[in-house]
């Protein structure tokens, strides 16, 4: 499970939480695009990636 700080960041700004774990990898870019198109899909993806 992701650390508390990563998940907390992901709730408010999803790409930041993913960036803290994966850097500028594919997960970050997918999360950024999802968040730009609609916040909720980006949030769901960020929580999923951080807790898998």
From Swiss-Prot:
Membrane topology value: Multi-pass membrane protein
Q: Where are the transmembrane segments?
A: 4-24, 30-50
Keywords, alphabetical: Membrane, Transmembrane, Transmembrane helix
Q: Where's it found, cell-wise?
A: Membrane
Where is this chain primarily localised?
membrane
Q: Keyword Lyase on this protein?
A: no
**GO cellular component, as recorded:** membrane
Instruction: Please name the Pfam families in this protein's record.
Output: Pmp3
Which superkingdom does the taxonomy of this entry point to?
A: Eukaryota
Q: Which family does it belong to?
A: Belongs to the UPF0057 (PMP3) family.
Q: Can you name this protein?
A: UPF0057 membrane protein At1g57550
Q: Which organism is it from?
A: Arabidopsis thaliana
């Amino acid at each position: 499970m992701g650390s508390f700080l990563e998940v907390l960041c992901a709730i408010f700004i999803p790409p930041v939480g993913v960036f803290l774990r994966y850097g500028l990898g594919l997960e970050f870019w997918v999360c950024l695009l999802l968040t730009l198109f609609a916040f909720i899909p980006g949030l769901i993806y960020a929580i999923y990636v951080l807790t898998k």
